[in-house]
């Protein structure tokens, strides 16, 4: 019997030797941008390195890439993926006079302007905003948030095509270059700024594995990014960040053209009421799960660990519940970029993920996914779903996938097997981006192909079992489900086998 209630009643709460299936993404900043710390982060559980292009020079980001790759030479382990997070079409205030902070009392009336002459001359009477069309899209009565909602202003009057008269709704300080949010207002900013385009080209040149695309509002935004990446960057995965109401409204069309999704709850919690973020998170994750596309939950997950060695209980619950919702990956931002306890943060996230994964009722979840998936499915998906069912029926401890593109591993992951999924591929890029898929453990097979395709297949399967033994996934006597193609190339995975490790029936 495997119901959710039965699973929770019998939940093992003490630490064990479980295999963590949820990937961990860590933002690399000044505190962690060195080889020794990156090695320590990887040993603690880091799978994907994130570079935040809202900050830092190209020289700095190049050093992150170089150090990440050096860490793999020092500590080979599992392959490490590198993600480039774009700045995106943000709205920001200008520079304050003498770059000082100005106190703003409640009910304080002032001017917001798009006049460039105030771009470096802001104070508590007039504030520059770099979105030229703000006076065209906003109306009196609307609210403007500044500095992640620290300050709120009500629009009193659209004075002219460059000027808004506003009133503060709370007290606070206004600083230079702070973010501006317009909740409930459709903005018409371009999907990519010139800086974003240059950043993407930098990513292509340096062989990053995925783009975290900020403030995506429409499917066309994703297509625009793909155009900039071009032929040379065609294998880079585009993970869209949903962080405004437009992105939520257009989510279905966005999901169709994206490789994956990040639920970026920071700006989203400003754009829509915070209690609604809970529902949006669950809804978007469920849609990604059904589509078989990876989904990341991000922002303020272990925020207090930026300064404290231990998290709050609420933060641990947040991480765990994101995993129970169905997130493939969870992400750390300031905790690893500038925090005092980056290793602790990754360790805490890894330990929390293991406990949360124990609470999942795998067979009811599998049944939900099978029943809700439109039929007919592709041959590869049919085999992937059957392999997950076979795990339960055979008591198998591992699913072993041979894949060139990683698509088969993605589809196996969709159906959430209780056991690990070992992916064996000759393509290093496939191995690295496959960290995005829940439960997938990628390994690169570096030997040249044998002339005999059958012998080559056997060698790769044998390598996968050896890696699984080395990592403690299986031992002699365990059943293994393997998926492979009937011939070489991409898109031919249609064969499932059951083997016993070290037994008479083992033929791999």
Curated annotation (Swiss-Prot):
Keywords, sorted A to Z? ATP-binding, Glycolysis, Kinase, Magnesium, Metal-binding, Nucleotide-binding, Potassium, Pyruvate, Transferase
Q: Which CDD domains match?
A: Pyruvate_Kinase
| Molecular function terms, GO-annotated | ATP binding; kinase activity; magnesium ion binding; melatonin binding; potassium ion binding; pyruvate kinase activity
Give the binding site residues for substrate.
50, 266-267, 299
Pathway listed for it?
Carbohydrate degradation; glycolysis; pyruvate from D-glyceraldehyde 3-phosphate: step 5/5
* Binding-site list for Mg(2+): 243, 267
* Keyword Lyase part of the UniProt annotation: no
Taxonomic superkingdom: Eukaryota
Q: Enumerate the InterPro entries for this protein.
A: Pyr_Knase, Pyrv/PenolPyrv_kinase-like_dom, Pyrv_kinase-like_dom_sf, Pyrv_Knase-like_insert_dom_sf, Pyrv_Knase_AS, Pyrv_Knase_brl, Pyrv_Knase_C, Pyrv_Knase_C_sf
Name the cofactor(s).
Mg(2+); K(+)
Q: Does the keyword Iron apply?
A: no
Site positions for Transition state stabilizer: 241
Q: What class of enzyme is it?
A: transferase
Q: Which positions are annotated as binding K(+)? A: 52, 54, 85-86
Enzyme Commission (EC) number? 2.7.1.40
Provide the residue positions that the database annotates as binding ATP: 52-55, 92, 178
> Cellular component terms, GO, for this chain's entry?
fungal biofilm matrix; mitochondrion
Q: Which Pfam families match?
A: PK (PF00224), PK_C (PF02887)
Under the heading SUPFAM superfamilies, the entry gives: Phosphoenolpyruvate/pyruvate domain (SSF51621), PK beta-barrel domain-like (SSF50800), PK C-terminal domain-like (SSF52935)
Assembly: Homotetramer.
Q: Which family does it belong to?
A: Belongs to the pyruvate kinase family.
**Annotated protein name in UniProt:** Pyruvate kinase 2
């Amino acid at each position: 019997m495997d119901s959710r209630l039965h699973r929770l009643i019998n939940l093992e709460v003490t630490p064990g030797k479980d295999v963590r299936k949820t990937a961990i993404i860590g933002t690399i900043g000044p505190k962690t941008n060195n080889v020794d710390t990156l090695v320590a982060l990887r040993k603690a559980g880091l799978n994907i390195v994130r570079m935040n292009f809202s900050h830092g020079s190209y020289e700095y980001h190049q050093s992150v890439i170089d150090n990440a790759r050096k860490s793999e030479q020092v500590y080979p382990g599992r392959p490490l993926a590198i993600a480039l997070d774009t700045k995106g079409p943000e709205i920001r205030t200008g520079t304050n006079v003498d770059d000082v902070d100005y106190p703003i009392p409640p009910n304080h009336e002032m001017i917001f302007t798009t006049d460039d002459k105030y771009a470096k001359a802001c104070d508590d009477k007039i504030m520059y905003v770099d979105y030229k069309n703000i006076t065209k899209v906003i109306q009196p009565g609307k609210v403007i948030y500044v500095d992640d909602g620290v300050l709120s202003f009500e629009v009193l009057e659209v004075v002219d095509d460059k000027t808004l008269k506003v009133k503060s709704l709370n007290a606070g300080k206004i600083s230079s270059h702070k973010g501006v949010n317009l909740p409930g207002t459709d903005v018409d900013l371009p999907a990519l700024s010139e800086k974003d385009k240059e950043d993407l080209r930098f990513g292509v040149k340096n062989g990053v594995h995925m783009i975290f695309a900020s403030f995506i509002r429409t499917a066309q935004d994703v297509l625009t990014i793909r155009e900039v990446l071009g032929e040379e960057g065609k294998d880079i995965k585009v993970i869209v960040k949903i962080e405004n109401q437009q992105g939520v409204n257009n989510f279905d069309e966005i999901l169709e053209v994206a490789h994956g999704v990040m639920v970026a709850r920071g700006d989203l919690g400003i754009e829509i009421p915070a209690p609604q973020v809970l529902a949006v998170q669950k809804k978007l994750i469920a849609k990604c799960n059904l589509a078989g596309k990876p989904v990341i939950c991000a922002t303020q997950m272990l925020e207090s660990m930026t300064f404290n060695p231990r998290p709050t209980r609420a933060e641990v619950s947040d991480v765990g519940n994101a995993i129970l919702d169905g997130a493939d990956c969870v992400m750390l931002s300031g905790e690893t970029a500038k925090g005092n306890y980056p290793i602790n943060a990754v360790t805490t996230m890894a330990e929390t993920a293991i406990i949360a994964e124990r609470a999942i009722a795998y067979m009811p979840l599998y049944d939900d996914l099978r029943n809700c998936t439109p039929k007919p499915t592709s041959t590869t998906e049919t085999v992937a779903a059957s392999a997950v069912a076979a795990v339960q029926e055979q008591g198998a401890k591992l699913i072993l996938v041979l894949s060139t593109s990683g698509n088969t591993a993605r589809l196996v992951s969709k159906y959430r097997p209780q056991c690990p999924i070992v992916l064996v591929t000759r393509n290093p890029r496939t191995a690295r981006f496959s960290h995005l898929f829940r439960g997938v453990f990628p390994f690169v097979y570096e030997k040249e192909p044998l002339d005999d395709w059958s012998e080559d297949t056997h060698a790769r399967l044998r390598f996968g079992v050896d890696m699984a033994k080395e990592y403690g996934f299986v031992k002699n006597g365990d059943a293994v489900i393997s998926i492979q193609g009937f011939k070489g190339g991409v898109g031919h995975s249609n064969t499932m086998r059951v083997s016993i490790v070290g037994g008479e029936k083992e033929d791999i």
